[in-house]
Curated annotation (Swiss-Prot):
Superkingdom: Bacteria
Biological processes per GO annotation: arginine biosynthetic process via ornithine; L-arginine biosynthetic process
The organism's taxonomic lineage, starting at the top: Bacteria, Pseudomonadati, Pseudomonadota, Alphaproteobacteria, Rickettsiales
Entry EC no(s): 2.7.2.8
Protein name: Acetylglutamate kinase
Binding of substrate, residues: 89-90, 111, 217
Species of provenance: Ehrlichia ruminantium (strain Welgevonden)
Role of this protein: Catalyzes the ATP-dependent phosphorylation of N-acetyl-L-glutamate.
Cell compartment(s), UniProt: Cytoplasm
PANTHER family on file: N-ACETYLGLUTAMATE SYNTHASE, N-ACETYLGLUTAMATE SYNTHASE, MITOCHONDRIAL
GO molecular function terms listed in the Swiss-Prot or TrEMBL record: acetylglutamate kinase activity; ATP binding
Pathway annotation: Amino-acid biosynthesis; L-arginine biosynthesis; N(2)-acetyl-L-ornithine from L-glutamate: step 2/4
Length: 322
C-alpha cells in the first residue's frame, strides 16, 4: 500500500493556518484548536494501519507517564489505528538481579544472559512488567492482552553470537557467547492479525522460544523491528530516555536518512543502547514502506505529539536523503 505523503515537511501549513485574533485573543483555545486541526491529515492517513510501539524507560517507571502512555494507546485504537506494544524492563530486571548480588554485562546494548539471569528476566518481564502494562491499558478503557514471544509460538528466536578481534595484529576473529540471548527469526502474524480484527491490543514481552525448546532473552528493540516488518506496519515508534537521536554536538536530529543513521553508528556517535535502536530503525525503513521514530518517553503524551502534530518531538528515520 502506498501512503499519502503528509510528513512533517510536506504538510501544507496554509491548510491549518489560524490566528489568535479569531479566538478573541484566547491563547489556550487557539493552541487546542490548532493542535486538533493539525491532527486530521495524520488520522486520515493512518486509520486502519498498524503501529508497533516499543515501550520502556522513564515512560514505564513513572506512574503519571505510564498512565498517559496507556491513554495514548487506547486513543490510537479508538482512532482506527492498530497499536501493538512491545516492552522492555531493564530497570526492573536490574533491581531483581541486585537482590541476588548479580551484575550484568552488556555488549552493544544487549545483556549477556546466563541461565540464572534468564530465569529472572522471564519472571520479571512476563510475570510482572507485562501484566502491569496490560492492566494500565485496560484501566484506560482498552482491551489489552498480555503475551510473550513463547505464547502460541508468536516469535521464534535464534541464538545470537558476536565475533570480535582479540588482537588487531593477528586479525583473528573470535566468537563471544552471549548466553541465552536471541534475535527474532520467525513471527506468527496470524495471531496478531486476529487480535487486531477482534479489537484487542497485544502487549508483548520479548521472551521467546527457539530450537530444542530453549528460551531466549531478546532485545525489545529487535522484537519491535521484526514485528514492524512482519506486520507491514506504517510506523515503528521507540520510546527512550533521551530527546531522540543527536549529532556529535548533542543537537537533536529531527529527520534522519538511512545513510546518515548508519554513519552515526559507524563513527561512534551512536553508542550503547542507541545502537540496537538505530539498527532496528534502519532495517525497518529499508525493508518496509513506513517510517521509524525515536522519541522522548519522559514527555507526557509524547506519542500524540510525535504522530499528530506538524513538528513532532523526536527523530524520524526515513528511507530518503535529508
Amino acid at each position: 500500500m502506498k501512503l499519502r505523503n503528509v510528513s512533517k515537511n510536506n504538510l501544507n501549513k496554509e491548510d491549518t493556518k489560524l490566528s489568535i485574533e479569531q479566538f478573541g485573543g484566547n491563547v489556550e483555545w487557539f493552541n487546542i484548536t490548532k493542535t486538533l486541526s493539525e491532527s486530521l491529515p495524520y488520522i486520515q492517513q493512518f486509520s486502519g494501519e498498524t503501529f508497533i510501539i516499543k515501550y520502556g524507560g522513564a515512560a514505564m517507571t513513572d506512574k503519571k507517564l505510564a498512565e498517559s502512555f496507556a491513554h495514548d494507546v487506547v486513543l490510537l485504537k479508538q482512532l482506527g489505528i492498530n497499536p501493538i506494544v512491545v516492552h522492555g524492563g531493564g530497570n526492573k530486571i536490574n533491581e531483581f538481579l541486585e537482590k541476588i548480588n548479580k551484575k550484568s554485562t552488556f555488549i552493544n546494548g544487549l545483556r549477556i544472559t546466563d541461565a540464572e539471569t534468564l530465569e529472572i528476566v522471564e519472571m520479571v518481564l512476563c510475570g510482572l512488567v507485562n501484566k502491569n502494562i496490560t492492566q494500565l491499558i485496560n484501566n484506560a478503557g482498552g482491551n489489552a492482552i498480555g503475551l510473550c514471544g513463547k505464547d502460541a509460538n508468536l516469535i521464534e528466536a535464534k541464538k545470537i553470537c558476536y565475533t570480535y578481534k582479540e588482537n588487531q595484529s593477528n586479525n583473528v576473529e573470535k566468537i563471544l557467547d552471549m548466553g541465552f540471548v536471541g534475535e527474532p527469526h520467525d513471527i506468527n502474524t496470524d495471531l496478531l492479525f486476529f487480535m487486531e480484527e477482534s479489537d484487542f491490543i497485544p502487549v508483548i514481552a520479548p521472551v521467546c522460544s527457539g530450537e530444542n525448546n530453549l528460551t531466549y532473552n531478546v532485545n525489545a528493540d529487535l522484537v519491535a523491528g521484526a514485528l514492524a516488518n512482519a506486520m507491514a506496519a506504517a510506523k515503528l515508534i521507540i520510546l527512550t530516555n533521551v530527546s531522540g537521536v543527536t549529532d556529535s554536538n548533542g543537537n537533536l536530529i529531527s529527520e534522519l536518512s538511512v545513510s546518515h543513521a548508519e554513519n552515526l553508528i559507524d563513527n561512534g556517535t551512536a553508542h550503547t543502547g542507541m545502537i540496537p535502536k538505530l539498527q532496528t530503525c534502519v532495517r525497518v525503513v529499508k525493508e518496509g514502506y513506513g517510517s521509524a521514530h525515536i522519541i522522548d518517553g519522559r514527555i507526557p503524551h509524547v506519542l500524540l505529539l510525535e504522530l499528530f502534530t506538524i513538528h513532532g518531538t523526536g527523530t524520524m528515520v526515513v528511507n530518503s536523503g535529508v
